[in-house]
Amino acid sequence: VLLKKSALIVASALGLLAAPSAAVTQFAGNGHLYEFVATNLSWQDALAAAAAATPIAGYTAHLVTITSQGEDDFVKALTGSATFVWAAGTDEAIEGVWKWAAGPEAGQTFFLFDEGPVGYANWNAGEPNNVGSEDYLHFKANAGNWNDIFATFTSGGYVVEYSPSGSTIPEPASWAMLMGGLGLVGAALRRRSSRKIVAA
């Protein structure tokens, strides 16, 4: 009985430490799933936490990448009254070259400081301003537009985006299944060619 009570106390304490999150919600515009997690983290910690989110079958978790106005509006509505929320944009590698750091868009440039948008972008007026190592994208959920901010800033939350996985079968298993299937086809063809046809 004492062991059960101790386990219950530990489980309750861990539950209190868990960050509150909204329900996982699907955006009809792209079929992806989204989850807002309200917790104070740096951008790097949010990037890691999103990638480590509880798996959903057929989906891969990552920090949100916002690639359309519809997705932008959906994500902002999902975050409610949160003040600042992390997204996966960064120009840490090359100043002024904003790329997505996660998801299927990882490595894709979406904004060039000297030229403007290459893909979808929704910066506040005068942003990104690249002041003092502001290399990470967050947005003001209540105001709606994007801002660049420094690495040690702790935002009020982040959004996990669950993108459909390319395949639910790991690649090594795919090769094994392909080879096994080809072997079965070969065996069937050999058996078929070795059959004798008897005329009635």
Where are these regions (language model features)?
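N-terminal secretory signal peptides that target proteins for export/translocation
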Residues: 1-3, 200
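Compositionally biased, low-complexity repeat tracts
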Residues: 11, 27, 92, 103, ...
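Intrinsically disordered, low-complexity segments enriched in glycine/proline and serine/threonine
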Residues: 7-8, 74, 199
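A general lysine-centric signal
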Residues: 4-5, 196
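Extracellular, disulfide-bonded carbohydrate-recognition/adhesion ectodomains
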Residues: 22-168
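C-terminal membrane-anchoring or membrane-association module
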Residues: 187-200
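Short, threonine-centered small-residue motifs that mark membrane-proximal processing/anchoring sites
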Residues: 7-25, 161-184, 188
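Residue-level micro-sites within transmembrane alpha helices that shape
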Residues: 3-4, 134, 170, 189-191
